[in-house]
Amino acid sequence: MRTLTFILLLFCFVVKAQLTTNTSLTPEQLIKNILTGKGVTVSNVTYVGEADAVGEFDGSNSNIGISDGIILSTGTVLNNPGSVTNKGPVGPNNNAGASTKWNAPGDVELTNLIGDDTFDAAILEFDFIPQGDRVDFNYVFASEEY
């Protein structure tokens, strides 16, 4: 009975860790509709990277502590590339066949900082002007690379 209880508890944590991802929005739509709220003016949205390396996520059934947001990846944000809506990235990415290799350039600033090559950058940049005097945002940084 103890083994069954342990397995059921473990299964609950595994199920809880799932993100649902979606790559149907443009980078500008992601910033304006997902990241910023009322009272924020957004301009100069640029994205450099693969189309499946950026999207939105629903974290309500996960343990990351953020209900929704934008996800960027050096691989794919989808665990089934070619689909627009998905059950998110699969991890851990601990073997050579578990990631998506785009063979795309990395980030020049990171390359200069670490003194080695970087690859498959997903860079989302934008300017914003808040109407108020305070800006808050939540983020989670997760990586197999750093």
Where are these regions (language model features)?
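Aromatic (Trp/Tyr/Phe) and Gly/Pro-enriched flexible surface segments
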Residues: Q18-Y146
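Bacterial Sec-dependent N-terminal signal peptides
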Residues: M1-T21
